[in-house]
């Protein structure tokens, strides 16, 4: 029998535009196969029986989401997002007062694997702080001279990880940390950085490197390849 972790909900911030994709359509609404990237991302969350509800934070005035079949799903709630990612996540958290633990997942990350998600959810039994999916850095890392493209030095990649999503935290702790970080003008690039700012140390849960975020045009074809491969493996 699969493990169950009660009181788990999810927030998907989907109010961004993604100008690096060089399209007029926000990247989360680009299609892979017969579904949008957003639909793939949310479907991966709902495939786990522990996830009771998903709140999607969209841009005010968004007319695309309501046209998706996802908009009618009984476990989906939509709210207006904010100017920044942290604002959208907070808006989603406010719509989930019943949640004990909350996953936050990128709208443009469609290739989440269920085994990774299950191992992340297991943190609710062993941690009071939570953690994130992450992948160890494998490439040689270079730091550039400030404002230039010349190499300043090589960065030791030992103990360096790529932060992925979902990220998974107790709801009240995440609300408190995001609120404090925003009020104090801290730079928050993901949810874990808000906890770090407040003195907490979330866990790193090793995840698959093919859990990519679609950011640039070439990422779309790569995500399609990974999703197609995953479907073939499930049928095998």
UniProtKB/Swiss-Prot annotation:
InterPro entries: IspD, IspD/TarI, IspD/TarI_cytidylyltransf_bact, ISPD_synthase_CS, Nucleotide-diphossugar_trans. It catalyses: 2-C-methyl-D-erythritol 4-phosphate + CTP + H(+) = 4-CDP-2-C-methyl-D-erythritol + diphosphate. The record marks 20, 27 as: Transition state stabilizer. Keywords: Isoprene biosynthesis, Nucleotidyltransferase, Transferase. The gene is ispD. The record marks 157, 213 as: Positions MEP for the nucleophilic attack. One of its GO terms (biological process) is isopentenyl diphosphate biosynthetic process, methylerythritol 4-phosphate pathway. It holds the Pfam family IspD. PROSITE patterns: ISPD (PS01295). Homodimer. This is 2-C-methyl-D-erythritol 4-phosphate cytidylyltransferase. CDD domains: CDP-ME_synthetase (cd02516). SUPFAM superfamilies: Nucleotide-diphospho-sugar transferases. Belongs to the IspD/TarI cytidylyltransferase family. IspD subfamily.
């Amino acid at each position: 029998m699969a493990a169950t972790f009660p009181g788990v909900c999810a927030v998907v911030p989907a109010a961004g535009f993604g100008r690096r994709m060089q399209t007029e359509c926000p990247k989360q609404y680009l299609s892979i196969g017969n579904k949008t990237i957003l639909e793939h991302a949310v479907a991966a969350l709902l495939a786990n029986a522990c996830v009771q509800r998903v709140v999607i934070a969209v841009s005010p005035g968004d007319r695309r989401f309501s046209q998706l079949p996802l908009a009618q799903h009984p476990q989906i709630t939509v709210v207006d997002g904010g100017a920044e990612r942290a604002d959208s996540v907070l808006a989603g958290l406010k719509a989930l007062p019943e949640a004990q633990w909350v996953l936050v997942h990128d709208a443009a990350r469609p290739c989440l694997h269920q085994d990774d998600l299950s191992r992340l959810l297991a943190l609710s039994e062993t941690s009071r702080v939570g953690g994130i999916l992450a992948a160890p850095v494998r490439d040689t890392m270079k730091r550039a001279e400030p404002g230039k493209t010349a190499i300043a030095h090589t960065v030791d990649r030992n103990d360096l990880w790529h932060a992925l999503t979902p990220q998974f935290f107790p709801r009240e702790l995440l609300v408190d940390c995001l609120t404090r970080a925003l009020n104090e003008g801290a730079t928050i690039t993901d949810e874990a950085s808000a906890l770090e700012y407040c003195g907490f140390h979330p866990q790193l849960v090793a995840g698959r490197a093919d859990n990519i975020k679609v950011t640039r045009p070439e990422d779309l074809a790569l995500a399609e390849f990974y999703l197609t491969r995953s479907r073939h493996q499930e049928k095998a």
